[in-house]
């Protein structure tokens, strides 16, 4: 029980820090109109404004965090087994990515600044999880299992491998003057999702990547069949990569 309370306390602190860091950057983004692709941003779009304003950022982080806590943390907590530190770490990181997903959905652009916030949360969380008992309050000896050095090496290696693969898919077609099938923003996204998934194992990393492409492919096929997307058209892929990662994490603890 103390482990669950301590985990939720950590989630609350990290999510709050995420929100306060996102808010000023969000306001700057919604006002920026001077350089591409921001000059094409529909600044009056209700969903985009909701994602990038102070209040909308709070709702995104808190709601996303609450949903992900239920999907990822509670099933294992109810079994009575100690959760690994990578499990509660998933919640604030994925919650921090929700505003970036909303932006990508509307304008097909993953803002580097919003991604960097989630990356900073991931890095901080990995360090805290690695320290484990050293940072736990006195008297709490049933906290989540700390990460080992091998877990961290697998996370960094897995993230690097997937990033290189996605970056190649984005850059190589441009050498022949063709439009890339995947953007560099999606590759940058896996700098965050890759290590997060790899913390749970190589199978979770591969499952998350597969499900992301599967979800994105299903959406693209549906849009093609409905006539809302042309054969050479493009869709926002970031939200589906995030959905695939969340699904893989949920399946890894079910």
Q: What is each residue range found by the language model?
A:
Residues 1-254:
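A membrane-topology feature that recognizes alpha-helical transmembrane segments
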